[in-house]
């Protein structure tokens, strides 16, 4: 954290070494990807950390390090941290409230046409006290702007698996909690929640990882360049 009051910001620096350094050749740096994605998230109406600026240092076309600057969000902690520290006397009620709020956060992103790529409790900020908290997205370098709704559609499964159906999430949350999470995502639509549950319950980690990698390749290296070429301003005729 740097500065005070409304001017306070958070600066995150990402370093690339070895294979990761070589893979950065000719590509957008992580700080730029996250900066652009946070603006996309804000455009969907989803609360998130506000991007301020980014910078990078390259060598031979590869990124040595990049820095992202975002607004400081006061009185906030990660959802993972909050869930671990809830007092026993109110844990059930507040845990239920927070998980439903996270599911609605993901649903808002998907209705706005954004695939998070890292929909996990550690990447959700809880702003304020848990019982009345507002939730916000805070880490999106792996996100993909799809630009059309993906809520309840095949692409949404990648975020839902990360959010509540990966092996670590299955160990962390009960089946009842995961069902209520899906039901909140589906806005109470039990038929949709059941359909998503059946698909997610059968999904393996290998299938999830391979499918997500293919989806990212298609949208990042095919769809987005085509989109940029179509929206490029034509040169004026001489």
Annotate the PLM regions.
Residues 133-221:
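C-lobe/activation-segment region of protein kinase-like
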Residues 1-80, 89, 104-112, 116, ...:
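Conserved ATP-binding subdomain of kinase catalytic cores across diverse folds
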Residues 210-238:
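Membrane-proximal basic amphipathic "stem/tether" segments
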Residues 119-126:
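Hydrophobic residue at the +6 position relative to the catalytic HRD Asp in the kinase catalytic loop
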Residues 88-90, 173:
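Inter-helical turn/loop segments and adjacent helix faces that build the functional surface
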Residues 126-132:
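Activation-loop N-terminal segment of eukaryotic-like protein kinases
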Residues 28-29, 96, 172:
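Residue-level marker of alpha-helix boundaries and capping positions
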């Amino acid at each position: 954290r740097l500065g005070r009051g409304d001017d306070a910001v958070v600066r995150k620096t990402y370093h690339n070494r070895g294979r990761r350094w070589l893979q950065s050749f000719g590509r957008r740096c992580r700080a730029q990807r996250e900066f652009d994605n946070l603006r996309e998230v804000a455009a969907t109406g989803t609360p998130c950390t506000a991007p301020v600026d980014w910078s990078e240092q390259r060598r031979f076309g590869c990124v040595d390090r990049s820095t992202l600057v975002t607004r400081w969000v006061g009185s906030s902690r990660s959802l993972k941290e909050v869930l671990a520290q809830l007092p026993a006397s109110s844990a059930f009620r507040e845990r239920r409230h927070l998980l439903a709020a996270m599911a609605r956060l993901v649903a808002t992103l998907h209705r706005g046409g954004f695939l998070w790529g890292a929909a996990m409790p550690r990447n959700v900020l809880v702003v304020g006290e848990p019982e009345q908290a507002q939730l916000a997205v805070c880490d999106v370098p792996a996100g993909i702007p799809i630009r059309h709704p993906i809520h309840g559609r095949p692409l949404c499964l990648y975020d839902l698996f990360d959010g509540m159906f990966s092996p670590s999430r299955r160990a962390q949350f009960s089946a009842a909690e995961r069902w209520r999470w899906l039901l909140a995502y589906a806005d109470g639509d039990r038929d949709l929640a059941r359909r998503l549950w059946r698909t997610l319950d059968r999904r393996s980690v290998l299938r999830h990882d391979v499918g997500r990698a293919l989806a990212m390749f298609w949208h990042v290296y095919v769809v987005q360049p085509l989109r940029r070429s179509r929206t490029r301003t034509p040169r004026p005729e001489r």
